[in-house]
Amino acid sequence: MTTKRKAYVRTMAPNWWQQLGFYRFYMLREGTSIPAVWFSVLLIYGVFSLKSGPAGWEGFVSFLQNPLVLFLNILTLFAALLHTKTWFELAPKAVNIIVKSEKMGPEPMIKALWVVTVVASAIILAVALL
């Protein structure tokens, strides 16, 4: 059986996500994947430069000193921090921790995740510099 009625198609503008702050922040957070791809490609380039010997490594280090590359790496750092912040805020919603018959709030878990991140980063930095 076919119908002669036209299907209702709701119009949607290409910039629909710009109307609400929630959607703008969501798009910004999802956009942090682009700097992550940049950093992944940069790491792969560094590994292959290291494989090619001292001359290749020196070329990679001079590439890293380019102001544009430095700017992209700083942008990538901020994108990674934003992504980390949003995931750390999401973690307490996925886990119910009950202490003395009361559900623990999200703040202790978020703070603990940041402490672990800072400690792990400090250890990695110390090992790299020693």
From Swiss-Prot:
Principal subcellular localisation of the protein: membrane
Keywords noted in UniProt: Cell inner membrane, Cell membrane, Membrane, Transmembrane, Transmembrane helix
InterPro entries (alphabetical): Fumarate_red_C, SQR/QFR_C/D
Gene Ontology CC entries for this record: fumarate reductase complex; plasma membrane
Superkingdom of source: Bacteria
Membrane topology listed for this record: Multi-pass membrane protein
Pfam families: Fumarate_red_C
GO molecular function, one term: succinate dehydrogenase activity
Compartments in which it is found: Cell inner membrane
Sequence intervals crossing the membrane: 30-50, 60-80, 110-130
Family (UniProt): Belongs to the FrdC family.
UniProt cross-references to NCBIfam families, sorted A to Z: PRK04987.1
Function comment: Two distinct, membrane-bound, FAD-containing enzymes are responsible for the catalysis of fumarate and succinate interconversion; fumarate reductase is used in anaerobic growth, and succinate dehydrogenase is used in aerobic growth. Anchors the catalytic components of the fumarate reductase complex to the cell inner membrane, binds quinones.
Subunit text: Part of an enzyme complex containing four subunits: a flavoprotein (FrdA), an iron-sulfur protein (FrdB), and two hydrophobic anchor proteins (FrdC and FrdD).
Protein name: Fumarate reductase subunit C
Provenance organism: Yersinia pestis bv. Antiqua (strain Angola)
